[in-house]
Amino acid sequence: MLELKQISKRFGDKQILSDFNLLVPEKQIVAIVGPSGGGKTTLLRMLAGLETIDSGQIVYNGENLPLDALEKRNLLGFVFQDFQLFPHLSVMENLILSPIKTMNMTKEEASKKAMSLLERLGLEQHADAYPFSLSGGQKQRVALARAMMIDPEIIGYDEPTSALDPELRLEVEKLILQNRELGMTQIVVTHDIPFAEAIADVLLKVESK
C-alpha cells in the first residue's frame, strides 16, 4: 500500500499541490481526474523521481521513503502521455536502453526481459520495428513495457487515452484492467471521467489551483 501524506509542490509563485493526501491500495487502480493545472501529472512525475517534492511524507508498505531518493527506489514506472519513445531506436532498443545504463543489466539480460514483456503484450513481432511504424495503441504498449523494465512497484499513466480514437481507447482500458488481474498496482491520471469510471477501484477528483 502506498500512502501520501501532506504532499506539497510549488513551481515559482504557483502552488501546484498543497497538503495533498492519497491512499493507493495494493493491486488496485486509482484514477485521479480533473482539469489541467490540478497537479495530476506533477504527482506522477514526483513519484517517479522526475520532480522534487517540497514537503510531505511517502509511506510504502509501512516504510518511510526518502523524498530525495525516489528515482533510485523505482517506486513508479511512468507511462508518458506522448509515450516519449526514441524515434531513432527500435522497440527493443527503446526497452533495453535504461536498464543497461541505470540498473547495470547486461544487454543479454535486458533483451531477454524485454522480449518476455513484448510477448506478454502481444508485440514480439514488432521488436525490430521503429516507433513511426506503430499504431497509437502499440506505442502505448511499448511505453508500458519500457516502464515495466525497471520492475516498479506501481505503474503510473499520464492521460493514457489522450488523442486516441474510441477503438484504441477501449484497447487501453482492457490493457489496464488486465494488468490489475495480474496483480499490478496502478495510478491513472486523466481528464476522461467515463474512462476513469470504467477502470477505477478508487476515483479521486482534483480541482485546478
Q: What kind of region is each of these model predictions?
A:
Residues A48:
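Helix-to-loop junction immediately C-terminal to a conserved catalytic motif
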Residues N64-G77, E181:
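ABC ATPase NBD coupling module
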Residues K107-Q125:
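Conserved ABC ATPase "signature" region
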Residues M149-E153:
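A short, proline-enriched helix->beta-strand linker immediately N-terminal to the Walker B motif
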Residues I155-D158:
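Catalytic Walker B motif of ABC-type/P-loop ATPase nucleotide-binding domains
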Residues G56-N64:
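Conserved ABC transporter NBD signature motif
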Residues Y130-L134, Q138:
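Conserved ABC ATPase signature
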